[in-house]
Amino acid sequence: MPGAALLFSAIWLDVPHVVQPERGCGAASVAMVMQYWARRVPIASPPLAEIHRALYSESTKGTPASRVLALFEKHGFHAFAFEGRQQDLEEQLRQGRPVIVARKPRGSDPHYSVLTGIVSERVYVNDPALGKDIPVDGGRFEREWAAAGRWMLIAVPRQEQ
């Protein structure tokens, strides 16, 4: 629904925030999700520099989704990336799973961030460049998410599933 505002009930997850290195929004988003799960299950979260080295592609000047999936799998996670819907976001957060999303703000490259909450007509993201639990108007989020193909990624530790 182009231009439709997202309408949600209240959900929020306490996901650690990680500041991105240059061109490292993907690495920082992966680190946030790994650190979130490391608080709940005995799973190792590698250092940000190691994650960035494994993910960053010099040829694309960014982080290919295929590398994100492979890194999660290598570190003991089941990871799934797909074109999502508003209901998918809410369902995953309700199940206690932070969601990595790709957004494409007008005039800029796609940017990874971690969806941490939804309250009424706002979503909250841990943005690797801007900070923790940044409120974003639901309509703006929908436009930016749609511009990036509504891409979302869920990663769950193997022993949690």
Q: Can you say where each PLM-predicted feature lies in the sequence?
A:
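Short intrinsically disordered terminal tails
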Residues: M1-P2, Q161
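Short, aromatic-enriched amphipathic alpha-helices that serve as compact interaction elements
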Residues: S29-V33
